A protein has these predicted regions:
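Short, glycine-/aromatic-enriched active-site segment of Class I SAM-dependent methyltransferases
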Residues: 167-187
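Activation segment
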Residues: 126, 143-144, 176, 199
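Conserved N-terminal segment of class I S-adenosyl-L-methionine
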Residues: 2-135, 146-153, 158, 188-194, ...
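Short catalytic micro-motifs in class I SAM-dependent methyltransferases
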Residues: 138-142
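Short glycine-dipeptide loop
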Residues: 159-165
Length: 235
């Protein structure tokens, strides 16, 4: 939105019929509109409900990691949903290997919701530092099977012994119903038993959840479109 548009919304002539909503107009005059990210903008244009599905996954992570000291998001993309987790934890950092998305994240950063974002290739080296929560949504399915151990080992390296990890991915069964855009790059989707077995190599406790659309459940997993592994007690 241009400065002239912001000024128009903030002038005396632009008054809402109900006074409690005037703050919406005034806020735009002060800071402009919040903007969607690269991927979330495309979703909102092409398939609005898909943006809701993605945000619901972040909401689940936010509630599971609520109260954490410092959480790391791996494969943040445009980080549009990251703020939902940030709202529930004391500190958050996010990383991705694609600078195009990271520059977009930085360009949209606002002071109230500022967090650390940095580039890192998980196939090249572990992430330094220490975190009591690590999560990756819609990432593992993009990692070839032969690179999976390297990726997970490096991703989990900074997780403290008492920390929690959450891994989310589309189910293998969902792929026959997925759109070409959704399937693009998916080279390592798993069934629920496969994902649980994978994460049990790294954790003593792995709790599995299913998702259909925005609903999280523990129902019949072959009919789930999305899988979430909640992991604790590192091996």
């Amino acid at each position: 939105m241009s400065k002239s548009d912001s000024a128009m919304l903030g002038n005396e002539a632009m008054k809402t019929r109900e006074p409690q909503y005037q703050e919406c107009v005034d806020a735009v005059a002060v800071r402009g509109f919040e903007r969607l990210g690269l991927r979330s903008s495309q979703s909102w244009h092409d398939d609005p409900k898909h943006l809701l599905f993605r945000l619901s996954r972040y909401k689940f992570v936010a509630k599971m990691l609520a109260g954490s000291e410092h959480v790391l998001e791996i494969g943040c993309g445009d980080a549009f949903g990251t703020r939902l987790v940030q709202q529930e934890v004391k500190a958050l950092s996010a990383t991705d290997f694609d600078d195009v998305f990271l520059e977009d994240v930085k360009a949209r950063m606002v002071e109230r919701w500022r967090f650390r974002v940095f580039a890192h290739d998980l196939l090249a080296a572990p992430i330094p530092g220490a975190y009591d929560g690590v999560f990756a949504l819609d990432v593992l399915e993009h990692i070839k099977a032969e690179h999976e151990h390297t990726f997970l080992n490096n991703a989990l390296a900074p997780l403290i012994a008492t920390g929690t990890a959450i891994i989310g991915m589309p189910s293998l069964e969902s792929q026959s119903h997925a759109s070409p855009t959704s399937r693009a790059g998916h080279v390592n989707c798993k069934s629920m038993p496969e994902l649980k077995k994978t994460m049990q190599r790294y954790f003593h406790n792995v709790f599995m959840f299913s998702m259909n659309d925005e609903i999280v459940h523990t129902g019949f997993h072959p009919m789930a479109h999305y899988l979430v592994a909640l992991c604790a007690h590192r091996k």
